[in-house]
Amino acid sequence: MSSKSQQPPTGLSKSAAKKRAKKAAKQSQNPQPQSAPQTSSQTPASVPPLPPASVPDPLDPAFFNFPGPGSYPIDVQYDDTAYYDQVDVPLNQGDFPGSYSIDYNLSLQNGSQLAGLSAPFNITHDDLISAANELYKRMADPEFGSDDAYWSSLPPHIRQFIRDAVPFTGSISQSTPGTTSSQRTMYQMAQQIVQAASQGMGLGHGMSANLMPGINANARSFPSPQQTIGEEFGFHRHPDTREEEYDDEEEIEEDQGHPAANGDAPKKKNKKKKKKGANAASLSAPVEPPAPLPPLPPPSTLSKIPRAPAPVPQPQLPTHQPQPLSQQPPSLNPLPPPAPASAPTPTPPSSRAAGKQPMGTNPPANPPARSARAAGKAPASAAPPHNAHAGHSHNHPSTAKPAPKGKSPATAPPAKIWTQSSAEDRENIRVFWLGLSEAERRDLLRIEKDAVLKKMKEQHRHSCGCAVCGRKKVNIEMELDQLYEQYYDELRSYAAEQRVAANGLRPPPSGAGPFPGSVEVDASGTVTQYDHRAPELHDHDPDDLDGEESEEYDDDDDYADDDELDDDDIGTDEADVGDEIDEPPPPPPITHRQQPRRPPVKAPPRSEGGDDFLSFGSNLATIKGGILTIADDMLKNDGTKFLEMMEQLAIRRSVREEQNLRDMQEETDEEEEEEDDDESRDEPMTEKERAEEGKRMFQIFAARMFEQRVLQAYRERVAKQREEQLLRELEEEEDSKRAKEEKKAKEAQKKKDKKKAQKQKAEEERLAREAALEEEKRQAKLRKEEAERERMRRQDEERVRREAVKRAAQEEAQRQALERKRRQQEEKEREEEAAKKKREREEKAKKEREARENELKEKERKEREIKAAKEKAEKERIAKETLEKAERDRLAKEAKEKAEKIRQERLEASRMEKVRKEEAARKEREAVEQAKIIAAQQAQRERAAKAEKNTADKAAAERISAARVIPVAATAPVLATLGLKSPSKGSTPQSAPPVPQLSPVKGAARPITNATPGRSMQKTPTAYYPQPVPPVGVASFSRMPLAQSFGPPGLRPAYPTGSPAYSPPRANGSSISPNPPSRGFTDPSPPGFDHNLRTAPIGVGFPPVKPSGRIPSMADDAFSPTAPIGVPVTRSVSSAGEMGSLISGSVTPDDYRPTPPAPIAPPNLGPIGRPSFSDGQTSGPNVLRSTSPPPPDRVLGSAALGADDEIVQPQQRRPTTSWDMPTAAPGSGRWSASPSIWGSGDPTPAPSWGAPGSMPTVAERPGPPPGLSLSPGAGVNVLGQRQPSFGGIGSSFGGVGAVGSVIGGGMGGTAGSGLVQGHVGGGGYSQGLFSPQHQQQQQLQLQLQLQQQQQQQ
């Protein structure tokens, strides 16, 4: 312990002095290694060398020396341009006798002219992250004290600073604005402190915005509980502050507890401790520190600002807490600032404080930027040493302190993250200051005073202008002037002492230097050396340490180091880093903190301004903490706090005498006051001591400000010297460079002259060589020109020769071309002659053919006219009989018709549903078959076209001759096969090639319910395509409509007159027949016809259903679907006996069985509107008696056409002679299955030989077998050709032989020789053909047919 001065320390109570003496004694007995070297007393052994001459900028910040921790914090953070740009600093122009040292690793802050000039001037990310790491580790310690009394003890400007710094969002108490209710609020506060520190350290908004993105997501929810809120706001613990130690278990248990839910600290009974004689020794032993435990979880709400205990190591956190920042990779970007929160309403100041404030009580919307010391209090990773006391030149060893119960062991606070000046800088400033003259020193101090006064006046501009405030301003200026005068005297005396010490006559003056009031603070804010006025420690009675019994602080108490001093002895937790330790006691004690109570001192009556800024007797440490902060703010052009300090100094000046008098009257014995511990206060200082302490505080402020001023002057001097040195070096370098250039120029000139001579010689040699070369080139050119002329002459001769040869070749080619053209012309003329003769022959043959055809057509027309007249008369008669019959039958069948109609409608509905379902399947099958048929038809058409072209002329003659020579007897077998007799007059049908049919148009089939019971009639769709032209010469009787009443009911024609079955050929889709088809009515099949006699047309491989009774020879071949398509069937009808057997009825239902299908089409694929043939429908009697509707597979009309069916145009059929089967166009049976020569208006097959009751509609009737026309008027017919109806079964016109007389004469059904199925005469009226249900339909049909016939005629 230093013993420079034996005088009692000023500004300290006896209890504090005793405590310090006791600590010093224990530290001297237990020396420990120093945590950091003490550099303030070091003197440079030798003058450091000057910086290198290569520094180009006279303002290069490299010579601003700010080394690491352990030195005084001279921060270059103020605005030089605004602070020092108005006054010229008088510098000593003479030689600088002192030595100085320059550090080239300077780190500057924003706001300085030198900031940003070099990369080393910015702090690293690692430093900032380390500071933030320590900050977050200290955030959530629940043991930090928080009480209103402590907050109230703070000066108004400190409280206002905290309010402006952190806008809290939690619940705010009346006197504590910094309370928060959640860890998130604490996290935001830490972020703001980091941001402020980053801005103060020169990082700017960009870097401080994202300081800690590397923190994992849980860091927000679980911050590290190692940083105090007070330290976050820029208030550090006093360097001598340590956690209190307990001497007995009773006090340890007494002080334990947690803050209550409402924010109040746990109440602890304030017991008056008595002296314990016997137990003092046992309680003096130090308590062993417990194992590190995780901090107890803080309550949900903490309404007070936690006080900052000694830094403790981070405890073992639970597994869910985030990893410490020190273990995480550093982030490249600073932490983003938290969302702005609404600032709480500040505590309204007292009337006295409000009168001293120049502005309103509301905090400014944008508070002034905090200094680096005030805003960036986040500790860094380096632990600072706390090993020096005021006035001590030695270091105290750091000893381990037993951690109190319920708390984690303490660790040294980390170092500050910005750089500070070192002892070498301080020595350089001292040497520079001593080297200045008296006038220069006075000028520097005057400049400093004027600058401070100017700042203060600028602050006064915004203050009140009343007389009271005016007097206050005058007092402040007077006080400031007097203080600076006193400080100048101190500077002069301190400089004299330093000069004497420099000569070695006496030791150097106490204090950190180089000026009176200077203190040295390391990077973490720990005071390492104090000012020269700092009081020394002396031994005192240990009983007076704490105002309690002497046993409380025994000699065996374990004080770790300087930080063991109680916070309440020397200041608050939020004391700034530059606080001195030799300060008076704080305000009245806080009974519920975790610190021991202060010794009871009777507080004297406070003056009116007793709680002001300079209440040195009770709150000096806090004020001195603010002194360095005020100085830093002044350096940053913020003089608000300085103005407050000066206002309070002026107030203190006015009440000083009164206070001195009051203090003298209230002095009592100090020992008695210490024993009276009810109030727990220290003895206040006297007014003189307070004045001295105030002067000391101002010296600290002025020294910090003046250090910057002198440092600026020193830097300017160094910069000027460096600039001069640099200019000299540059000049020398220029001279050297100029000399070298002159030397180089001379040498270059010599080289140029030598090279010039060499070039001239080389040029002469080159000219000689060029002259020789030029002559040689001229000779070569002459030779070349002569050779060129010779070559041109030879080329001309060759060109003339080639042209002559070419002309000869061209003449020969022209002659050959003319000869070839002549031959081609002759050949063309011969071909044209031959073609002309051929055309003449063809035209002649065509005219003859047309003449014959016209003759046949004329004959046929006449026959049709005769037939039409007869048919008309017959229809009238039949219509009359029909009406009479219908009237008789209508009444009898009306009841039956209704019942049958209802049943039939149900059956028809079910059948149509089934038809629709099977229609889709049939369409698919037909599409496949249609593709096959189209391919076969294409091949067939090609073969037919070739055969027709070659035999066109021959076929015409053969057809004429064949039609003339056919005997009548030859037609008998055919008629016998059909159950007919040949007509009395044999007709001579002539086979003519039918006109090619156009593609049919799909017609929609519209079903019409017929009145016939048990039968649902449907409208027959009309197909619009031409039919084959009848042979020339064959009489056409279709003009005479065949009335339905001309025959017996069993022999009715299958097609009504006027139906498409009787239609003549149509030209371009229009009907030219006298009886166009009726589009709404169809006839049922005659009862006497076999319903099962169904055949497929030519080209479709359907197996025909053979009729009852065996028809040999031609019938088999004609009905066999296995016969090749287009191959004529040459077998003729063998005899008429077999036809007779058909008529006789001696046949069996199963004699005529279907043969296997042809390979072209499957058996189940038929033309549109035709039912499929199956064996199940060929049984005779059962089918005849069946009254059920037709099977659902009979798709009617165009409904059978699929969307992908191709409309095939049948080709012209190949003519045949005699009984040969003509070649049918493939698919013609599909579209022209009508039994009439004129074709049907719809693709409806021929009527079946059905039994009574099974009367399918026209659309359901099957077609004839291949090669046979089973029309009602089946006259003489060549197999495979459609012929007009010349009478026949059931007609009124006579056929061949006696068949026409028998059948044509008797319509009543008594002579039934024309029936195919059943008995002769088995038809008749008994079959119900003309039943009443047909009457209305037949009447309308007959009327329409008659009208059409009349219109066409």
Curated annotation (Swiss-Prot):
Q: Coiled coil where?
A: 713-944
Compositional bias ranges of the Low complexity kind: 26-45, 317-330, 368-388
**Residue spans with biased composition (Acidic residues)?**
242-254, 542-583, 666-681
MF annotations from Gene Ontology:
actin filament binding; microfilament motor activity
* Positions with biased composition (Pro residues): 46-59, 287-300, 331-349, 1154-1165
Q: Where is the signal peptide?
A: none
Cellular compartment(s): Cytoplasm
Which residues lie within the region annotated Disordered? 1-66, 216-422, 503-522, 531-618, 652-694, 727-882, 979-1119, 1140-1276, 1308-1337
Give the main location.
Answer: cytoplasm
Any keyword Coiled coil? yes
Compositionally biased, Polar residues: which spans? 1-12, 218-229, 1009-1021, 1174-1187, 1209-1220
Which keywords are on file for this protein?
Coiled coil, Cytoplasm, Stress response
What residue spans carry the Basic residues bias annotation? Answer: 16-25, 268-277
Which InterPro entries does the entry mention? NST1
Q: Where is the sequence biased in composition, kind Basic and acidic residues?
A: 531-541, 654-665, 682-694, 727-750, 760-882
An example of a Gene Ontology cellular component annotation for this protein is:
cytoplasm
User: What protein family is recorded?
Assistant: Belongs to the NST1 family.
The task this protein performs is described as: May act as a negative regulator of salt tolerance.
Q: What is this protein called?
A: Stress response protein NST1
Q: Name the species this protein comes from.
A: Cryptococcus neoformans var. neoformans serotype D (strain B-3501A)
